[in-house]
Amino acid sequence: MAASAAVFSRLRSGLRLGSRGLCTRLATPPPRAPDQAAEIGSRGSTKAQGPQQQPGSEGPSYAKKVALWLAGLLGAGGTVSVVYIFGNNPVDENGAKIPDEFDNDPILVQQLRRTYKYFKDYRQMIIEPTSPCLLPDPLQEPYYQPPYTLVLELTGVLLHLEWSLATGWRFKKRPGIETLFQQLAPLYEIVIFTSETGMTAFPLIDSVDPHGFISYRLFRDATRYMDGHHVKDISCLNRDPARVVVVDCKKEAFRLQPYNGVALRPWDGNSDDRVLLDLSAFLKTIALNGVEDVRTVLEHYALEDDPLAAFKQRQSRLEQEEQQRLAELSKSNKQNLFLGSLTSRLWPRSKQP
């Protein structure tokens, strides 16, 4: 009985395992050939990707077309508006049209030529000075006209823009401004010629010169715009170039007349600065010596990195030479006096009866 029960249990377990294997085989699909599997995979991927790629490929191109159309419409509308606004005849105070040289042309040609002329004149206004004579004629007697003209830049020469947490942005006055104006006003006609706009510079000049030493003020619109720089053309000042000195911290500012300028280093806001005092001594020396043409003097300092330092060195050297000459002259005078007294003692003059 025990042996038969063991055999029966083994047969039952074998039948169970066989049924499981049969079910597994029936559930597993039969193997396909490699070519057939690849074809089916490509079809499936095509079906899966087809509907997704179509919107992605057509969407950006459609958006680009719409953007181009809008840009074209805006550009055309802007061009038409500009031609319409700036292409009309100018009008007088009563609203009547002022005739010009384009009245005989067709209407469209009139509009285009007037628009072109407007922008050409505007560009010329930016590049060229506002007038060929920026200053009025020199004063005549009985009024006093200083013999020389001093042209000063405002920013970097007289003022420094700085920022602090307590005050924010502000312009700081350079030490020695009052001394410079007081010493040079009788000898030089002082003109502020700055590359700043008038709206910015006018109140600054008022604060720098409360006593009215500055004769004239010129701003950015009076400069000549060249290669990205605002150039100060001395030929437009209505003054003799031989007696004009330009002081700036940029050599490009007087590039048209390089031997009329003194290039200083930009002031960094140091309160112990003494450059304006040295500048006053330098310009005062030129004026007191009655130099006929300042260019002959300034030409010697044109290649110097620091013209005022070079002037001080030459001045100290000349003072040493002058002291040495005076010492030698005093020594020779003492020797002559000693020989004269010795001669008078050895050969006394005969007394007149």
Curated annotation (Swiss-Prot):
Residues 49-60 have a biased composition (Low complexity). Residues 143-286 form the FCP1 homology domain. Residues 22-60 are annotated as: Disordered. One of its GO terms (biological process) is mitochondrial membrane organization. Residues 45-65 are mitochondrial matrix. SMART domains: CPDc. The keyword Cell membrane does not apply. Pfam families: NIF. It is found in: Mitochondrion inner membrane. Residues 1-44 form a transit peptide. Its main location: mitochondrion. Belongs to the TIM50 family. Component of the TIM23 complex at least composed of TIMM23, TIMM17 (TIMM17A or TIMM17B) and TIMM50; within this complex, directly interacts with TIMM23. The complex interacts with the TIMM44 component of the PAM complex and with DNAJC15. This is Mitochondrial import inner membrane translocase subunit TIM50.
